[in-house]
């Protein structure tokens, strides 16, 4: 093996890292750890804004409104079923 570097020396140089790169990684890890987030699961409060108008306290009212609308729709369908439909040309 002539004038080149050995494969072991090349591998050693690849395995070494620059100390400034490690410092950057450590600062990111430290800031992530101090944010009290454990990943995507806890990211939801970060993306919700204060402009969000609905919350869990509004849910019973919204469900009640849906139930009322559904009841009215059912009553209208029952009325329609009780009355025979007349063809358009019979009334003339």
UniProtKB/Swiss-Prot annotation:
Family that this chain belongs to: Belongs to the PKI family.
Organism phylogeny: Eukaryota, Metazoa, Chordata, Craniata, Vertebrata
Disulfide feature: none
Positions of the record's site feature: Important for inhibition: 37, 40-41
Protein name stated in the entry: cAMP-dependent protein kinase inhibitor beta
Function: Extremely potent competitive inhibitor of cAMP-dependent protein kinase activity, this protein interacts with the catalytic subunit of the enzyme after the cAMP-induced dissociation of its regulatory chains.
Ranges annotated as biased composition (Polar residues): 7-26
Keywords in alphabetical order: Phosphoprotein, Protein kinase inhibitor
UniProt KW Phosphoprotein keyword: yes
A Pfam family hit: PKI
Residues annotated with Phosphoserine modification: 56
Comp. bias (Basic and acidic residues): 70-82
Region (Disordered): 1-26, 70-92
Database matches in PANTHER family: CAMP-DEPENDENT PROTEIN KINASE INHIBITOR/PKI
GO molecular function terms listed in the Swiss-Prot or TrEMBL record: cAMP-dependent protein kinase inhibitor activity
């Amino acid at each position: 093996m002539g004038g080149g570097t050995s494969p072991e020396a090349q591998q050693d140089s690849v395995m070494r890292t620059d100390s400034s790169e490690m410092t950057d990684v450590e600062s990111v890890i430290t800031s992530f750890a101090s944010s009290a987030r454990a990943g995507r699961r806890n990211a939801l409060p970060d993306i919700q804004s204060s402009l969000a108008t609905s919350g869990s306290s509004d849910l019973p009212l919204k469900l009640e409104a849906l139930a009322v609308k559904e009841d009215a729709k059912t009553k209208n369908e029952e009325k329609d079923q009780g009355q025979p439909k007349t063809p358009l040309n019979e009334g003339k």
